[in-house]
Structures are given as C-alpha cells and as structure tokens.
A protein has these predicted regions:
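Short, flexible, solvent-exposed loop/turn segments with mixed acidic/basic and small polar residues
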Residues: 23-28, 58-64, 177
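Mobile "lid/hinge" segments at catalytic clefts and subdomain interfaces of large enzymes
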Residues: 142, 147, 151, 156-197
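Compositionally biased, intrinsically disordered low-complexity regions
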Residues: 13-16, 32, 73, 163, ...
C-alpha cells in the first residue's frame, strides 16, 4: 500500500513554507487564518463549541469554507501557538488549508441521511481524508465523494472524485474547479470501497 510521511512528522520542518510553519494561511492584511481539519465536514457539538470559544477569545472572524471546514480569520502570528494549543487539546489538527497537500475530502450526506444516497459517502470521505491527510504533492489537491449520481459533493470537479453506484464507486481523476474548470475522467467503474481507498 502506498504511504507518505505526514507533513508534521519530526524532521520535516526544513521543507515547510512559511504558512506550513505557522500552521496558518497569511491573509492580505498580514494576519492569519486558522483552519482545523474537519473530515467530511462532520463535527461533534463539543468540538464546534471549542471553535466558537477560540474565535471568541481571540476575536476571530469565522466562516464556513467551500471545503466544508471552519476557517477562523484575523489571528496575529504571536497568537497562533495559543490558538493551536487550544485546538490540539480538543483533538483538532491542521487542515493544511495552505500547503501543497491534500486539502480536504468533500462529501454529501450519502446513504445515511439522503433519500437518494446509495453508498455511505461520509464514511468513505472520512476514511480517505484520514488515510491521505498530510500527503505532500507538487500542488494542492482535493477529493470529492458523492453518494449518488446527483453529484452534490461536486466529485467530478475535484482532482480525485468518487460517485457512488449501487455496485460500488465510479472513480474520476483530473477534475478541476479553478480558473479552467473541467470534469474528471472516468478511470474505474463500480470499484469496491477497498479498491478505491
């Protein structure tokens, strides 16, 4: 199985960029945004309360991102260690919202909640994000997992996309939602969950 070292492992600090070292993304006014990892956009109420408390304590602007995460904006560089201490103590880690690595795995509600879902897209997205988080790459990359062919997670517009079928998952590669939008190309049809992970 393919594995890569986690971006925050000991001894890897020398290859980090400024934003990587700060575990935050510098904004245009010189402050930073802090974006903890929230696999598949799932967050327990207790963790949500921690984000609210941190944002309140440090007077941060809070925004739900297009990547189904919660961004906190306006942090000063000297505040970052204290912010991350609170977040790490609550079980969060960096969402690498700034690095050349896996940004996120976006998911729809899937078969757990949606009447159209034919596979557990949330469970698959959590598994993929936990499996590939911190993976370094030449450029940022994103996954999308849709629980049916309605495509609510925009899976075909991601670098790697999965769309559930009644027999498994269709795997799409090479999608792009940026300046030159493109649908990914179908790579594998009806793959099992084990095959796509």
């Amino acid at each position: 199985s393919f594995r890569n070292s986690y971006v925050l492992d000991a001894g890897r600090g020398g290859i980090q960029e400024t934003n990587d070292r700060a575990l935050a993304n510098m904004q245009k006014n010189g402050t930073y945004s802090v974006v903890p990892r929230i696999p598949a956009g799932e967050i327990p109420a207790k963790k949500l309360a921690v984000i609210a408390a941190v944002a309140d304590e440090f007077n941060l602007y809070v925004k739900i991102t297009g990547a189904q995460r919660i961004g906190m904006f306006g942090a000063r560089l000297e505040q970052l260690p204290y912010i991350w201490e609170r977040l790490v103590d609550a079980g969060f880690e960096s969402g690498q919202a700034y690095g050349k690595s896996l940004r996120n795995v976006k998911s729809c509600l899937g078969s757990t909640w949606c009447r159209y879902g034919v596979q557990d897209s949330v469970g698959m997205a959590v598994e993929l994000e936990n499996r590939y988080r911190g993976l370094r790459s030449p450029h940022k990359f994103k996954f999308g997992v849709s629980g049916c062919n309605r495509g609510c997670a925009e899976a075909q517009g991601k670098d790697v996309g999965l769309i559930a079928t009644t027999n498994g998952w269709n795997l799409y590669l090479g999608g792009n939602g940026g300046a030159n939008p493109a649908h990914g190309r179908l790579f594998v049809k009806d793959a099992s969950s084990e095959e796509v992970v």
